[in-house]
Regions:
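Cap/insert and terminal regions of metallo-dependent hydrolase folds
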Residues: 207-209, 217-326
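Binuclear metal-dependent hydrolase catalytic cores
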Residues: 2, 22-211, 220-222, 286, ...
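Bacterial N-terminal signal peptides
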Residues: 5-15
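Sec/Tat signal peptide C-region and signal peptidase I cleavage site
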Residues: 18-20
Length: 331
């Protein structure tokens, strides 16, 4: 009798707790199927800096990676992001889609590395590359330069027997507008102001929007592209350094690059959730930018300031969230 009473009481308590025993319990919300990450593969300038590779940024959506620019060291930085940051989509063989902002050497010197190393690492399909006029010619010349290597690796009677597709490149010369779209991302190009034909890119994914300026002075097109974006990646240089440039370089910079004051004003109008400053003429190396926060003239002719100068100058004029990007940062 006591056992029967205990069973009935237990059932009643269960009913009181769960309500209707036939009604399924609520389930935890499912995670989003994708999570977009921004990986800074290179934040440097034309001046060699051991801490900073040439400009290169990866937008990673799930298992897919999309590169913007391929400066010196891009593939090795991608491998470092794989090994040190766990970004598996950046395995070199998986680097299959890339965009270039303009054809200056500091943004493109890693192009042959991207083509050839990705192929020898196992890429089995042609790489798709998008950029301004001149990209096709650059691509053809790179492939011709490595013709003997390609022939040696693909000869049927040879020992290497590399696949015959992974070295190929489909180069697309673009204009403003939507230039790429797949199941996870839409990429829109917009014109920027630099020394040659140049573009910035906006990436729209299921969970984030990312805008990358490339080299440019501040433009209304960048502000329009960034309206409501989650992340804006933009170049900048410290006013303290800029004001000490020789007149000819100051004139070039005024028309083709962005100062700390200007990036603060631009971001105030564009209102990104996060501003990432990259391709800044700064260095963490005292021999390149001394701790006294004064620019220094290198033997290469480059001028750099220390990062805290740039941080201070932007912070004095911009109230939004911003960071000074470093290689292998993930956001």
């Amino acid at each position: 009798m006591k056992l029967t009473y205990f069973v009935l009481l237990s059932f009643l308590m269960l009913f009181m707790v769960d309500g209707n025993p036939q009604e399924p319990k609520s389930q935890a919300p499912k995670e989003r199927p994708t999570r977009t990450r921004v990986v800074l593969l290179g934040t440097g300038t034309p001046v060699p800096d051991p801490d900073r590779s040439g400009p290169a940024t990866a937008v990673v959506v799930g298992d897919s990676a999309y590169l913007v620019d391929f400066g010196p060291g891009v593939v090795r930085r991608a491998e470092a992001a794989l090994l040190d940051r766990g970004v598996t989509a950046l395995e070199p063989a998986n680097l299959k889609v890339a965009f270039v902002t303009h054809l200056h050497s500091d943004h493109t010197a890693g192009y042959s590395d991207l083509i050839m190393t990705g192929w020898t690492a196992g890429r089995r399909t042609p790489i798709e590359v998008y950029g301004p006029t001149g990209l096709k010619s650059m691509t053809e010349h790179i492939l011709e330069a490595y013709r003997i290597d390609i022939e040696t690796r693909t000869i049927p009677t040879g020992d290497q027997r590399g696949n015959r597709e992974g070295w190929r490149v489909n180069a697309h010369e673009i204009k403003s507008g939507v230039v790429y779209k797949d199941a996870t991302v839409k990429v829109t190009a917009f014109p920027t102001q630099h020394a040659m034909e140049s573009y910035g890119y906006r990436f729209d994914t299921p969970d984030r929007s990312v805008v990358i300026s490339g080299d440019s002075s501040p433009t209304d097109e960048t502000i329009k592209a960034c309206k409501g974006c989650d992340v804006l990646i933009h170049e900048a240089r410290a006013m303290e350094m800029f004001n000490q440039l020789p007149e000819d370089r100051r004139s070039f910079g005024a028309h083709n690059h962005t100062t700390s004051e200007q990036v603060a004003a631009l971001a105030t109008k564009a209102k990104p959730a996060l501003l990432i400053v990259y391709h800044a003429w700064i260095s963490w190396w005292p021999s390149i930018a001394p701790s006294a926060n004064q620019p220094v003239v290198l033997t290469t002719g480059g001028f750099h300031s220390s990062p805290d100068v740039l941080q201070r100058e932007i912070g004095a004029r911009y109230s939004g969230h911003f960071v000074i990007g470093r290689d292998l940062d993930v956001y």
